[in-house]
Each structure stands twice: as C-alpha cells, then as structure tokens.
C-alpha cells in the first residue's frame, strides 16, 4: 500500500479554505482565475517539511511507501515547469531543486521504504512547458535522488481536460513516452493513460513498454479485476467505458466514488451482498435495456430462473447506441446468457401481462439525464 503525497499549489480555488493559493510564481489559475501567492523561502521550507511529515505518518500507519505527486495538479510539477516557475532565485535557476529536495528528505525520513514519483512528462504546452524530450532528460536526475519507481502521466494547468480523459481519447495515450522514459531509467516505470482493457495492459508489460500499468477506473468498475486476470477469467471482468460520470475524485465535497456500470462500487460497506444465493424463484424481467439486463444478471447470480422479454429484436436499449455504452450492455447480455437467462425478443409490454412468474420486474421507460 502506497500513500500518495500531494500539494496542488497554484491550481485550485481558495473558496473552501479562504487562504491564498501558493505557487512558485504569480501565474493565474486559468480555471478559477485566481492569482496565487509567490512562495517565500519560509513557505517553501514549510511545504517540504509537510511532505516529509506526511511520509513519516504514512509509514508509521502501516503503508509500504509514499508516492510524491509531480503530476498534473501538483505544486512539485509547477516548480519543474517553465510555464509556472519564473523565479530568479535558487528555486527558479534550478527548476529540479524543489523536487529533488523533497525526494531526498523523504528518503532520509523513511529509510528503505518505497518512494515513487508521479511525473507529468508532457504538459501539452510546448511553448514553455515540460515536453517528452525534456522529461527523458529530467527523469534520470530525479530518479538518482532515491526513487524506487516512476509513474508517467501528462497534463498541466493549461490542459486539465487531458488529465483524465473520457472515451473520446484513445486508450494508452502515454505508451510512447512511457517507453522512452523506461529506456533511460534502471527503476520500474509504470504506464498510466486510460487503459481499461486487460489485454492492453498485459501487452504493454510483455512488450517491455513498462513494468506495470495503472488501471484505476477499470478497478472501480470491477474491484475484482486483478483476481479475475490472475484466474484467467478475463471474460467476466465488468468493463469500464470511461464515461467519467461518477468516478471523478477531485472534488472538495468528497463525494462517494462510484461507477455508472457498477453502482455498488463505493457502497461496499453499506449495501448488502446482492449475489447471496437464495431460494430459487421464477423471475420475469420486462425490458432488456441496462436496467433489465442488470436485474436479470443479479437475479440469475442469486440462483433464480430468469426470463427477459424485450420489444426490440436485440438487447441493450438506447445504451447500445450511445457512445461506449454498447460495450457494457453487450458484456452484460453475454453474462446473462452464460448464466442461463432466456431472452424473448419482439415481445411488446402488452404481451407480458400473464407470464406465470413468481416475480415480475418492469425495467422499461428510460429517461434522459444530465451528465
């Protein structure tokens, strides 16, 4: 278990804490339009000590190590970048000094525990920001300070939409830069970049692109993803469709992180086990859209005999045609078939008045919602 250590610096808003944002230079936050405070030496020292103390707390709490964030939303990246670091003192003349100092002092504080770095290797702002070529030179300098691994990410204050893109962006967009960084380092490098399909993750590792792959959203959609991969049961992995509807976590209100395709995710401590085996009943489900398929899947897993009635000639409802939704409903349909669920297509609602079932679930009539 690795604790993530972060300070967002000049990115964000003072609306909640009512204190000025801190940053290397007074570069406006393009989203909140706030101008941050230029960090004085005492401020710099305080933040460095904060990272050190946080690392100590993480280790004393049982974590195996700490990961320092120099990614898209981080103060550490802001010191590394010419976009946001315009200082003429030591912290600006050597833009790596802040990051190197934090890594070295954290290493002194936690000894042999694991230390990782999350590094933005492309700020997508070539006029002044960190570019892939710069990152290839930068990574070895930072690794030499005592890193055990490095995670390649991308983005900056000027490219927030690229931080955690949805399905409009191709999967594995950081593959090329990750491989370049891996080639110049002798520590493990991890690939991050909207990879949600197991075969893509395995391919990246097998081809030597990286030592491992981050699959955060994929594991929100299916918390058992790793276990299913180890058991060679990939077909049963509930697919993440990268819709970004309920899994976004950068929210000061601290909402529950859950998932559109797996609504029980995030509610494990309060919801019952929906798949507990019970006395078998005959269950009829009217409608084979996402709701009907999920109801049929859940009922079948609980041991019921399930039959689904759908007016159209295929399952999935409107979701089958909406963006990446077809991927999910196709998976759900295949899982239902594998569980023995019987489907009856071309059956109108009027024809489902006498089904002879113990339980009838009406799952028709979807309504449009605001994303």
Specify the residue positions occupied by each region the protein language model found.
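Exposed boundary/loop context
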Residues: 209, 309-310, 358
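C-terminal structured "cap/appendage" subdomains that terminate the fold
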Residues: 202-213, 220, 314, 320, ...
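Generic structural signal for residues in well-ordered beta-strands
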Residues: 189, 306, 343-345
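Flavin-dependent oxidoreductase catalytic cores
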Residues: 1-286, 290, 294-301, 367-371
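Beta1-alpha1 glycine-rich phosphate/pyrophosphate-binding loop at the start
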Residues: 285-339
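A broadly tuned "polar low-complexity/structure-edge" signature
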Residues: 261-264, 334, 343
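FAD-binding core/adjacent interface of flavoenzyme oxidoreductases
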Residues: 243-251, 339-371
């Amino acid at each position: 278990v690795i604790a993530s250590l972060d300070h967002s610096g000049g990115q964000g808003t003072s609306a909640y804490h009512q204190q000025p944002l801190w940053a290397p230079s007074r570069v406006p936050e393009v989203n909140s339009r706030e101008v941050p405070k230029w960090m004085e030496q005492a401020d710099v020292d305080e933040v460095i000590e904060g990272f050190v103390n946080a690392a100590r707390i993480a280790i004393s709490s049982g974590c195996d190590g700490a990961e320092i964030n120099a990614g898209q939303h981080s103060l550490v990246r802001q010191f590394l970048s010419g976009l946001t670091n315009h200082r003429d003192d030591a912290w600006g003349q050597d833009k790596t000094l802040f990051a190197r100092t934090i890594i070295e002092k954290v290493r002194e504080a936690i000894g042999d525990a694991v230390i990782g770095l999350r590094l933005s290797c492309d700020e997508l702002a070539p006029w002044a920001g960190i570019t892939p070529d710069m990152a290839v030179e930068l990574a070895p300098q930072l690794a030499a300070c005592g890193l055990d691994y490095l995670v390649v990410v991308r983005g900056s204050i000027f490219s927030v939409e690229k931080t955690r893109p949805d399905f409009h962006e191709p999967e594995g967009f950081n593959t090329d830069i990750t491989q370049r960084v891996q080639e110049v380092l002798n520590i493990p490098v991890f690939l991050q970049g909207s990879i949600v399909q197991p075969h893509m993750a395995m391919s990246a590792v097998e081809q030597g692109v990286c030592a491992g792959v981050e699959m955060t959203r994929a594991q929100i959609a299916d918390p058992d993803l790793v276990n299913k991969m180890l058991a060679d049961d990939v077909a049963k992995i509930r697919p993440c469709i990268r819709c970004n509807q309920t899994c976004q976590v950068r929210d000061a209100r601290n909402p529950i992180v859950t998932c559109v395709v797996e609504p029980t995710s995030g509610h494990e401590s309060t919801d019952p086990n929906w798949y507990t085996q019970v006395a078998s009943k005959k269950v009829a489900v009217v409608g084979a859209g996402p709701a009907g398929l999920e109801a049929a899947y859940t009922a079948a897993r609980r041991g019921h005999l399930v039959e689904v009635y759908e007016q159209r000639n295929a399952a999935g409802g409107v979701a089958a045609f909406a963006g990446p939704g077809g991927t999910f409903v196709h998976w759900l349909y295949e899982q239902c078939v594998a569980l023995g669920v019987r489907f009856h297509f071309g059956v109108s609602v009027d024809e489902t008045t006498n089904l002879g079932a113990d339980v009838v679930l009406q799952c028709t009539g979807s309504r449009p919602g605001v994303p």
